[in-house]
């Protein structure tokens, strides 16, 4: 559904209201801003950087740019929570190559994550090669410039989130990994979890991620200031390689180019597949993303599986038990290190108690009968945890993490039958507006509440108006202004970005977008099992209601055959099975077949170039392109969604 942009005078960003100014002043009074330890640690060991820090693809397409963040040199403005402003300064103004200790280096703020570089006997061991090839290649080039040219001799992916692996082709080639020439080490279930998260639900996650990471916001005091987790997310070329060395159990040892790694499995915590590791040579513990200098997400607003806060706390505790008496340095995949055993262990134990407090108190209140919304209002950290900057809501929040713990144990339903079978948003919006005297009446009353600073309430009631009538200009305008004030007040960067992106979309309409497709790099690395799972998700039931067919696939580049069937409007696929009398048989390379199904090439082109051979009832494939849904990258979020079959 499309709708017209607001008139220019209504579409401009507004200043902070008096209520917002007072809210942010209260934060300034509450927290110990005189504590500068984080700034000292963030700048320690600096070697060099790129000036300006602008990374491009092909010389003209900008994929990452920190040159726009000079405004963060100033004092926090009224339009940014001062605590979040502090985190933004730490993330954006400390970029480049840093020595953690001799032989152990990090490139920070070339992307949302850090790339760690370890000097091995003959080359570089790379930990977490960022989100895009452009950023990882630039980070490696910076290290080679300042530390001397060395080849990459191993890659370690700490976990299954794209900002830690999708830039891998910027530091090695596909053949390096496929041949085993360069070890690529990852945790158990890495491939399945990486592709499940980034492919099966990839389109909806990517769309919501544009809100969470503020991709469409302009940097500035009324716009984007940080992601909280890092300075910004790179928007370059992504890829994927299948690891050739899988770590399965705590205590496993690997020696990579002469450097010993001692692994601890931390599955199902911050990511479904994750490990941390200790480096005895450096007395350094890499906590991956299990600890960071903020409260992380037990549930991420971009959408993902709810994480286990209790297991998360337990894994941090286990790290202290396993390595606490040996470590001198603690570093991670985001933010800055901590030096000194006592400092590092104190920090880790407070991170442990942060997640355990939220877990325990959520369930205490749930057992009294409180629902997730009531619990979120009541769970408050004790000052011993809440006044630590490394525990603040810069990414996750106590509010939405407590709701996540509730859902982890009890699901979305709160037991009240009124919420068991709800109406969809557009329909419920129309009925609320009718009951409340019509849209004009609702907007008039909402404006009074806006003037009183009741922004959460205004957002709730005006959402009903906009969902029932997105062309109601006064409602959209006031709702945009409301989201904006909520964003200005937010300490969480994702909350700020969600609110400000919602305001932008209400004012300017949907951004232009294309059809979602996996990248060629992802396609080449994707196992066939994951490809067929994705095709099953894309199958449109009404279109294939009468289809009953089987397809034998013979992969010319693999010792592998597959059987695919479509019946009952469901696609199933199995390896090492073939139908005796298939409807169709297709022979070709696995890469070409993946590229065809993912829309990166066509069957006609492959057949015409003799890369694909099709036999059997070829006519049964007529219209096959219509069987599978294509997903728009830019579906509406703050206005009614189109009804899909």
Where are these regions (language model features)?
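Divalent-metal (often Zn2+) His-rich catalytic cores of metallo-beta-lactamase-fold enzymes
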Residues: 4-23, 294, 311-374, 378-415, ...
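Feature captures hydrophobic
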Residues: 445-448, 454-460, 467, 471, ...
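N-terminal pre-domain segments of enzymes
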Residues: 1-89, 93
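Metallo-beta-lactamase
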Residues: 99, 123-125, 131-134, 148, 191-267, 311-323, ...
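TPR-adjacent "capping" and linker segments in tetratricopeptide-repeat scaffold/adaptor proteins
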Residues: 350, 418-441
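Active-site metal-binding motif and surrounding structural segment of the metallo-beta-lactamase
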Residues: 122-123, 133-185
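Conserved beta-strand hairpin/beta-sheet module of binuclear metal-dependent hydrolase folds
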Residues: 90-150, 275-279, 283-289
